[in-house]
Amino acid sequence: VIRRSRLERAEQLGVATVRLAAGQTQRQVAAELGVARSTLQDWRKPEAVGAPPAVLAAWMETPEGVRWLHQLVLAAHFSITLQGAAGIRVVCQFLELSGLSAFVGASYGPQQALNAALEETLVAVAEEQRAALARGMLHRDLTVCEDETFHPQICLVALEPVSGFLLLEQYAADRQAATWTQALKAALVGLDVAVIQGTSDEAGALHRHVEVDLGAHHSPDLFHGQHEVSKATSLSLARQVRQAAATVVAAQQVWAVERAAQQAYEEQSPRPCGRPPAFAARLQAAVSEVVQAEVAHTQAQARQSEARELVRELGILYHPYDLERGQAQPVEQVAQRFNGVWTQLGRIAQAANLPTRARERLAKAQRLTTQLLATITFFFATLQWQIEALALPPDLERALVEQLIPALYLERVAARSTRAEPRHRLRALSHQLLEPLRHGDHPLQALPSAERARLEQVAGECADRFQRSSSGVEGRNGQLALHHQGRHRLSDRKLAALTAVHNYHIRRADGTTAAERFFGRAHETLFGQVLQRMPLPPRPARRRPRPPKPPCLMPLAA
């Protein structure tokens, strides 16, 4: 028995409709199509499900209608289950509410099978695209951001921070250094890359994995240092502000009571016999208490504000280039600024009499200084050998090191700024550094356009080398948490499908996918490739009326 697909059936039904309209009999048309006459009659029988418009129902039986329905159903699965973090039952409900259940089997079983096929196809297409893009890939030195998340199984996640390309996303039995190294090396097979830097938290296994197993530089995540400072100061200082405010209120109430007592005494007529109470001394003491409480409150607020500003200062000073002038910051200058911050925080801790646990947190954050300074040293060292490898004349090399790379770095910092004022100021400073390079008499303008583009690309890679945050992988962990919350379990196939969607489908504002940014080449659309390989959606089953359920207390037959 030959089983025809839904599209083949629609195509043959279209041919049969034309021939029947031309006057041929059903028997003749069935013989020409190679089907039984009863099969042709069944094809032409109207569906007994739903009540869609006749025009729509007829169009759905055409090849164009079948293809459109195929694309629509797959788009629903793709968007709802792989990007919207919802389940298959939401897709079933969408098909019911939209009326598409008249043309597609909307029950859970058929849709679950279709969703499983979609995930398998996604993974296969992503692997093929990765292999195709890797064949023409130029060698790259990578920075890798790494972190673990828990579902509660351990999930290892690693991505390249500039492109956002997920290099690794898989479950593991543990999170030891050897496990990390084995998983990452397997993920990089076939890619012409070398990991020269890893950015992560301060987990010992990640340190060993990056520095010992990979022989790369470990760049600490600045946020973790800032977070330690915030935990050490925010709660205690906020408590002191609240207590000082309560003391001010209590002192003001005492002063008000004393003043009211004085007024009540003076309003008495006649006044009581004897010496009057010492209202002046009591009021003076109450006023003194109010002043002291207000001073203490002001000092507590000042310490709290200063601590917050110092946390921000850690983020402002930790850059290879000065954000005020756009010039390179020597490591000694950055170290001096760090020491100033730690000194001020120590003074606040002493003035506020912070508890021992808070002082230990401050010491823990301060210990990161050595690694932070080492990262700036690493940045300038790699920048130097990468620029020297270009073998440029001294004037061009100076232009790249002192103007182009700092300008591109400031441009990237401005793009990540959340406030308008620093964003506009940094962009203006970047433009100021680039302006001389754009003049026609500058040596850079004498180079061919292809050479200028190559130098700009190298300068951009140098600017991107400084990575002080692993927030990209933290954000990915948050997305995985949403998917896990909706399902309570992510299979290896589901996780691989989610990785494929992230790398080859999701596009930034510039219209590029993570894979295009990572490999430097465009690729065919993921959904288009999947659409060509996926089976057609199942037809709805003919509804059979169910017999009514008899009452539980129906009497038995005699």
Which residue stretches match the model-derived regions?
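Short alpha-helical "recognition helix" segments of helix-turn-helix
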Residues: 28-33, 91
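Catalytic-core elements of nucleic-acid end-processing and repair enzymes
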Residues: 293-295, 300-429, 436-443
